Amino acid sequence: MKEVGIVGYGSDLPKYRIKAEDIAGAWGKDAQAIKRGLIVNEKSVPGPDEDTATISVQAARRALSRAGINPKDIGAVYVGSESHPYAVKPTSGIVAEACGVSPDFTAADLEFACKAGTAGIQMCMGLVGSGMMEYAMAVGADTAQGAPGDALEYTAAAGGAAYIIGAKKEELIAKFNGTYSYTTDTPDFWRREHEHYPKHGGRFTGEPAYFKHVLNGAKGMMAKMDTTAKDYDYCVFHQPNGKFYITAAKQLGFTEEQYKYGLLTPYLGNTYSGAVPLGLSNILDHAKADDRIFVVSYGSGAGSDAFDITVTDRISEVVDKEITTEKLLESKKYVDYAVYLKYRGKIRM
């Protein structure tokens, strides 16, 4: 296998936000207690003209801009999401066409709850590492759903990030040292056909689901690389809320200085398939040469993908070619609960 890594990355977020207070107020709930419990203050809201496809296209275009490559050299495009706009019509084809990739490539839409994006990255690593193609692109994006009044309403958000994987050493902005996955059959979160909103196991989504898989995925990666938390400069984990993320990070021995750039949920909500890709993009925006990054995703159902990544000196050349994730977070406009319901199509007759 060739050494492979990231040659370009890009992110995208909707401009709209809703505060936890507005959601709680509509349902007569204690906003401060909810914010303390979840460590989520506000979340992104997709506009009426935004969906997983539009977010993926924008993120992919920014990744191409940073990579500086010919899009027709990309041999595979994978879009991971649990909110593809069509049940039958691939988002990946839309993204590729909009970015000038088509038609000489392979594509697929991926689903594995919130880790479909990182699964796509692993697939790209294999295709490029085997020499089958020069570049491959993976996108993780979602416009997540939460039923009115459900706890998910405070966190289910929208956003995504794209990564272009390559093998030319002089083009790498970060190289993959290794990857590891941990998967079981765990029914913590699900949505059947024709259902508008997912169901979840409440507290069951914690210890036997999120923590079991994230911690085992992390420990498996560290065992494979013979490392501990002290060997890394930064880390990012899946973040259904801020509390789970911080708890997992601390249990693994990571400090706030290591996990702070990856933690976006308090200001963004849970972007599902976009959560870890977005957290990683923010870390890359702040990273410097030789920084080492520890990554663990999580997807309900359930599984985790882990990565060990080292940043190269080329990072300083590409960050400012596109808008950073932090700038996207800062560019926002608040909406109230009524507008939120309208934009999310939750008013049903």
From Swiss-Prot:
Pathway(s) where this gene product acts: Metabolic intermediate biosynthesis; (R)-mevalonate biosynthesis; (R)-mevalonate from acetyl-CoA: step 2/3
Xref: CDD domains: init_cond_enzymes (cd00827)
Annotated active site: E82, C114, H238
Enzyme class (EC, first level): transferase
UniProt protein name: Hydroxymethylglutaryl-CoA synthase
Gene Ontology biological-process entries: farnesyl diphosphate biosynthetic process, mevalonate pathway; isopentenyl diphosphate biosynthetic process, mevalonate pathway
EC numbers on record: 2.3.3.10
Family per record: Belongs to the thiolase-like superfamily. Archaeal HMG-CoA synthase family.
Binding site for (3S)-3-hydroxy-3-methylglutaryl-CoA: D30, A31, C114, T155, T205, H238, N270, S300
UniProt GO molecular function: acetyl-CoA C-acetyltransferase activity; hydroxymethylglutaryl-CoA synthase activity
Reactions this protein catalyses: acetoacetyl-CoA + acetyl-CoA + H2O = (3S)-3-hydroxy-3-methylglutaryl-CoA + CoA + H(+)
Subunit structure: Interacts with acetoacetyl-CoA thiolase that catalyzes the precedent step in the pathway and with a DUF35 protein. The acetoacetyl-CoA thiolase/HMG-CoA synthase complex channels the intermediate via a fused CoA-binding site, which allows for efficient coupling of the endergonic thiolase reaction with the exergonic HMGCS reaction.
Cited function: Catalyzes the condensation of acetyl-CoA with acetoacetyl-CoA to form 3-hydroxy-3-methylglutaryl-CoA (HMG-CoA). Functions in the mevalonate (MVA) pathway leading to isopentenyl diphosphate (IPP), a key precursor for the biosynthesis of isoprenoid compounds that are building blocks of archaeal membrane lipids.
UniProt-annotated binding residues for CoA: R203, K243
Key words, A-Z: Acyltransferase, Isoprene biosynthesis, Transferase
Name of one Pfam family that matches: ACP_syn_III_C
